[in-house]
Amino acid sequence: NDGYFSPRIEYNPFAHTWSLGVEEQFYLFFPVVFLLWIVWRKKTGVKGTIAWWILPILTIASLYTSYWLGLNKPDWGYYLIPSRFWELAAGGMLYQYHTEKRFIPTSNFNATWQLWIGFSFILAGLWWSDRQHFPFPWALLSVTGTLLFINSVIDQGQGKSICKQLFNNAIAVYLGKISYSLYLWHWPIYSLMRWTIGLETIGQQLLALTLTMLFSMTSYHLIEKGIQRSASKLSISSFTKVLGGLTVIVLTFQGTSSLFDHRHRLSLSDTKDSYTWYAYDHEVKNINEEAGQIFGTRQMFVIGDSHAYAYSTMLNEASKRLGVSVYNYALGRCALGIMLLPINTRAGCEGTSERMMDIVEKKANPGDIVFFASLRTYRLIDQWALFDPQSTLNKSKNASTIKDIFHAKQETSILIERLDKMGVNVLIDLPKPVFNAPPFRCSDWFNQDNPICERGFYVEKSFLVDMMTPVVDSLKELNQKHDNLILWDNFSILCPD
């Protein structure tokens, strides 16, 4: 659950390395294409045509791949080099045209308008890009803007334009030189500060920026420039350089793999034993798989939000201990039976109920179970902010919320009735207790002063009961109406008197 769009992404210090991986894949392939261009660009006939057209053809193919994957496999389209190649190749083509004196601004006026239009495109891409349709078509804005931006600051032979003054000064050039180091260091520094002292205040943000600059400058001068200076002074054969590089890669891979394999033993955190506290899928311990199997012919369809996955280890145990076959469908914000609001009218969730019911109707047998698993209450905290308890309590009882709960109850009642006609039982968990602070972020000496931990963990049980009452009452009404509905009160177990 540490993917690029996971809620936990801001706490993963390695999250940004995937884009570096895509970039390095490009640099493995691109030199071959570029070498053909260098050798054959002055040729006539087939060789000259190949030299000038191979990169544009590959770029067009990549752009189409980006379009197709965006429709059919959006995750692949976002992560893989075939669908991202065109963004990097665009800069290569611009350089090729510049060597032929093409597209170069002929006046300061042309350079200036390209600068500001390019800058506007980049800002528009940052502000309006839809991640559901990225890189195609929304990356076109930022790529086009970057091309115009670069084009505006090349040497025009027209004296010192505003573009040259802005972006060819010593500070801008130096920032460009250390830009790789800036990208490499900024994310782990920000992630570690989020884990420890926090990154909420202006002072903390300035500290993060300062540390990023210091680490970037140090790695640039000692590593990037240092290696270049050392290589120029030492007479090392190309074979030795390649062999040394491969050795470093192998050792780094082995060391990193070993580090991750043993991270639970190396961790300084009290939360290192994720089997105890982290509910996501773990191998079940101490289970005699031949002990029961009393539900060997039964199936359970778990349909919900992220809490459907939070039950993974428990469901795995049920499968091994009782023999029940478990199918887990986590639908995020479109979870069925969430009870806080109707789903069918929620933007982006239209048709979700019908799709899931079709799956159940095709697979389920009489006596099977559908488990609607959701949180079903408001949070007092999320990954990024604290919520005022009194405002949250008021929200749980205001007229708009009560109306949404009523419509959600009607919607869920229809689903339960349809399942009853199939002979399928329904299990719904009552709202669970919520904390004032996330334990996995506030349990260690190095993060207890984090602003996210300032309220501590304790919450009055009466407050939680009061906040959950509208949803609980609505579920109890459903329970009285439908004989095939079972309510699971885990609140009383997790928060006893």
Predicted ranges, named:
Residues 130, 196-203, 213-214, 221, ...:
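Extracellular/periplasmic envelope-modification machinery, especially enzymes
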Residues 1-233, 248-251:
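Membrane-interface helix/loop caps of multi-pass membrane proteins
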